[in-house]
Amino acid sequence: MKTIYTTLVTILLYGTQLGSVQAQNASSQPWSLRQCIDYAIEHNINIRQTANAAAQSEVNVNTNKWSRLPNLNGSAGQNWGWGRAQSRLDSGAYTDKSSSNSSFGLNTNVPLFTGFQLPNQYSLAKLNLKAAIEDLNKAKEDIAINVTSSYLQVLFNLELSRVAQSQIALSQDQLKRLNGLFEVGKASPAEVAEAQARVAQDQMSAVQADNNYKLSLLDLSQLLELPTPEGFTLESPKEDIEFAALTPPDDIYTQALAYKPSIKAAEYRLEGSNNSIRIAQSALYPQLSLNGGLSTNYYTESGSTTKSFNSQLKNNLSKSIGISLNVPIFNRFSTRNQIRTARLQQTSLALQLDDAKKTLYKEIQQAWYNAVAAESKYNSSEAAVSANEASFQLMSEKFNNGKSTFVEYNEAKLNLTKALSDRIQAKYDYLFRSKILDFYKGQIIE
């Protein structure tokens, strides 16, 4: 428990300090996906709130742990009186006088039997703490998935921007060539104008692609709670994608049931519902407690001889000890209804667990089929790029030899550009889908 508490406090108190060091180094080197995820976990507000809730559950465990100990309370009082009253020190006659009374006391109470309420409250608090920790783990998983999606989106937009820039270079080369041909009368003004329009269109596409990249980088930096995206760069992934055999959905589901935070939290809360029922049932049992006390006082009265303070405290000391038994007989069916409510809550928690398992299985199935489709799409896009590269190469040679028009050349160029863009999209779609499957298998996303 102490280790858990230390971890929660570290997340709450030191996350900002640790992260600020990384933020200062944001411009020094590219960030890996793992670095982005770790940084987001340290700074995300939702995670810090969830960690705070888990820390509160830890306090509740500590409170219930010591609730079986005796309590000890002290009391002190001071009263003054004046007027006609019976004397407590002399003959007991009624006289006009003023008096002062100082009282002191200690009392304690020990619960001997509470109908098993206290041990069940302690067990419930421990299970609630475990569930709260799993809630924290789920919050970390959620931010990891969000960061992964945003990270890959940045890389995707960056590659599209590079493709757009390369298309400008190709268009400018062709414009330069057509200008040369125009000067010697081998190209028409319409062809030159069309080439100029193509350059302008490619430049506009490049500006849009670059803007998309900057916006996605801004989204990621905001997700990481970075003050600015300036100087924030990402590591480039491997050029070649390694395709591994996909684990069957049923096997992934079996693995996920053993560790998935959402499932574990639901299981802990369902287990705790048994304690909640026993806590409600404890009101059916008699309650037995032991109590004791010490009290003394110091009294003075005008016109009378008063013994010393210490003497009176000693002589007036009284002691008491007793046992209190409270037997429930009829409480307007309140206990019965509380037990019914606890059992209904248990049924609701059981349904929630069942729903969580079914939802998990559906998510794994969808992730698996999406990964299969993404792999097929990438393979198809590879073939499309190869075919369009060959077609564009042939069309370039024909255009340079004057055997094709600029329209035909431009169409081949656009087809190649689309094929390259489709391959980039398929590449990052597969990377994301495969990481989702790794996530369900309990592997660290990096």
What is the meaning of each model-derived region?
Residues 1-33, 445-446:
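Bacterial Sec-dependent N-terminal signal peptides
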Residues 52, 62, 201-226, 385-443:
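Short segments within alpha-helical structural elements
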Residues 23-73, 77, 83, 228, ...:
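Bacterial Sec-pathway N-terminal export signals of envelope proteins
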Residues 48-52, 65, 98, 112-140, ...:
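Sec/SRP-type N-terminal targeting helices
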Residues 142-255, 370, 374, 416:
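Periplasmic alpha-helical coiled-coil/stalk elements that build and connect Gram-negative outer-membrane
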Residues 24-29, 75-110, 236-245, 278, ...:
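Small/polar, glycine/serine/threonine/aspartate-rich low-complexity segments that form flexible
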